């Protein structure tokens, strides 16, 4: 397998492609984070649409560049819309990204995610350490939608999920993991304040979907999306903040300001932020 290029130039190229193509990214997500997800998608250069009705969702998927299925809100109507939209996107060959929010916390969520995995092909799956561990069928500590506990084997776990689902897996945590069946990348970027803002995980899911909709190959899309997202978190902190609210504003501004030209100016040590397991 060819290594993915990790450099300021490669990241700039992905950002440029995303902004030039302006992919339409359909989100079926939750009401808690929907506004920040839509805005971050727009600020990356993609076009967000939040069509999530049982009829409207599958119809909108016909023209989408990528679809994000987020299980942060589970009810009968939305759950069915999530399922049918994923099926419709598959039928058109449109990349589908799964964010299994809360996987491992309730039987209802578990049943929905398992149904999605059984019937829908996913270009990428993004979840926190606990959610990815629960997807693997291992014991995970998920409290509500938050991952708690220790996950020393998360790289192996993410790779196992990638192999079983034939997809790219992004496991977000202190060190982000991007895994396929035959490669594992550890991404060292981000800031601790990202964990103090509700919705950063959902925004990462939207970011992965945006890059998958604009960048042709899924692994580079997921890897560059994860790296860019962490860099934005660091830049938001560098702007100065009084607490989570001002940091959140800085974060969205930093997404907007990470242009292809800005990415090219990132120092040459960027490659050191990503380590491939051998």
Predicted regions and their residues:
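Glycine-rich phosphate/adenosyl-contacting loop at the front of the ribokinase-like
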Residues: 1-47
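General beta-strand structural signal in soluble alpha/beta enzymes
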Residues: 27, 49-52, 97-100, 124-128, ...
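Conserved phosphate/ATP/ADP-binding segment of small-molecule kinases
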Residues: 110-184, 193
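Short, well-structured alpha-helical segments that form the helix of a local strand-helix-strand
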Residues: 157-161, 218-233, 252
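Short pre-catalytic strand/loop immediately N-terminal to key active-site residues, enriched for Gly-Thr
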Residues: 188-199
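Charged C-terminal helix
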Residues: 230-278
